[in-house]
C-alpha cells in the first residue's frame, strides 16, 4: 500500500545515518530503505551516497545519505513515515514541533534498529537515522505544521 497526497507541502527530504565498524552496512542500508514506500525503494537504492570517514580512534565510519528532490516522492515518503508512527510517537512529534522546526525544515530522528525491523519509532539516542524534511513556505507556524501532519496521517491509501 502506498500513500498519495496532493498538498504540495514538502519540497525535499533527506536521510542520513552512520554505519559504525561494528555494524553491517547492508543492514543499515536496509533500515534506511524501510523508511521509504515500497515502490520507491529500488530507485532509492541506486541513489544512496556513501562517504567514509574515521572516528576518534581511527575506526572507519560510513555515512549514508539519501536525498529525494522530487516533491511528489518526498511528500509520499514523508506521508509513509508519519503514517507508520505509533499513536504515541505521532503525538510526541506533534507536541515537539517547535523544537523540531527551524528555518523551513522539520528535523526527525528515528531508531535505526527498529527501522531495520520495519518499524518507524522516534528516538533521541545516537543510534538513529536523521530525517530533514524541507517544508514549503506556507508551513511555518506550529499549528499549520500540526494540521499538515494530521492530514498526512488521514491521507487515503491506494494500491501500488
Go through the PLM ranges and name each one:
Residues 24-27, 72-79, 117, 140-146:
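Short, conserved charged micro-motifs
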Residues 1-45:
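Long, hydrophobic N-terminal alpha-helical segment
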Residues 78-125:
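Long, charge-patterned amphipathic alpha-helical coiled-coil/hairpin "stalk" segments used as oligomerization
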Residues 42-72:
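Short, charge-patterned binding micro-sites
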Residues 106-160:
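Glycine-rich, aromatic-bearing surface loops/beta-hairpins
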Residues 17-21, 36, 68-72, 112-114, ...:
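Beta-strand elements of well-folded, non-transmembrane domains
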Residues 35-40, 85-89, 128-129, 152-159:
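A common structural junction motif
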Residues 34, 71, 91-94:
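Long compositionally biased, domain-poor regions of proteins
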Amino acid at each position: 500500500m502506498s500513500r498519495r497526497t496532493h498538498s504540495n507541502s514538502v519540497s525535499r527530504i533527506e536521510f542520513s545515518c552512520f554505519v559504525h565498524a561494528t555494524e553491517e552496512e547492508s543492514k543499515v542500508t536496509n533500515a534506511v530503505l524501510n523508511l521509504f514506500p515500497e515502490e520507491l525503494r529500488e530507485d532509492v537504492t541506486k541513489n544512496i551516497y556513501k562517504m567514509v570517514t574515521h572516528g576518534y580512534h581511527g575506526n572507519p565510519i560510513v555515512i549514508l545519505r539519501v536525498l529525494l528532490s522530487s516533491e511528489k516522492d518526498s511528500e509520499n515518503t514523508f506521508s509513509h513515515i508519519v503514517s507508520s508512527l505509533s499513536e504515541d510517537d505521532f503525538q510526541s512529534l506533534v507536541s515537539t514541533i517547535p523544537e523540531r522546526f527551524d528555518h523551513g525544515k522539520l528535523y526527525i530522528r528515528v531508531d535505526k534498529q527498529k527501522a531495520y525491523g520495519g518499524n518507524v519509532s522516534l528516538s533521541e539516542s545516537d543510534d538513529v537515522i536523521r530525517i530533514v524534511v524541507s517544508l514549503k513556505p506556507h508551513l511555518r507556524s506550529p499549528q499549520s505544521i500540526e494540521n499538515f501532519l494530521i492530514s498526512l496521517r488521514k491521507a487515503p491509501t491506494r494500491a501500488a
